[in-house]
């Protein structure tokens, strides 16, 4: 993704606020697919000359929360409740120019939910979007 971002004149920042001792149980290839899809959407719909993508990883109780924020065109409030629905595309004219089948975020949602997590988004048009997902931390079961 790094070369792709460089070619698109995008900056990427990564902030990890989680201790190295914290573990999750997850399929690394599937989580990579989730992150690649979300960042790919940020790149695809970026409308700024100097786009930014920030990735933050936080420890939130029993979960690890990942936030992927961009400063792109954003998603209309009327579309936000549906972006994880299979085949949903926000604007037909925009999507025909950028391609895509409208199933990427539905697959992302399934992967996260299959890992016992949750995914959601906030967005402001012309300001950007933040995609959030949480994955449960690994916790040892005490011996009795």
What do the PLM-derived regions correspond to, one by one?
Residues 70:
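Acidic ATP/Mg2+-coordinating residue in the GHKL
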Residues 42-43:
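Short helix-loop "hinge" at the ATP-lid/N-box region of the Bergerat-fold HATPase_c
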Residues 75-89:
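Short conserved segment of the HATPase_c
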């Amino acid at each position: 993704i790094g070369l792709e971002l460089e070619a698109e004149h995008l900056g990427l920042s990564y902030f990890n606020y989680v201790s190295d001792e914290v573990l999750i149980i997850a399929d690394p290839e599937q989580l990579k697919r989730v992150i690649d899809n979300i960042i790919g959407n940020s790149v695809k719909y970026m409308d700024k000359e100097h786009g930014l993508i920030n990735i933050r990883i936080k420890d939130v109780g029993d979960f690890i929360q990942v936030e992927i924020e961009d400063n792109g065109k954003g998603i209309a409030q009327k579309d936000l409740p549906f972006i994880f629905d299979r085949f949903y595309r926000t604007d037909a004219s925009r999507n025909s120019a950028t391609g895509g089948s409208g199933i990427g975020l539905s697959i992302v949602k399934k992967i996260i939910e299959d890992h016992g997590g949750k995914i959601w988004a906030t967005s402001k048009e012309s300001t950007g979007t933040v995609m959030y997902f949480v994955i449960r931390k690994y916790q040892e079961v005490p011996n009795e």
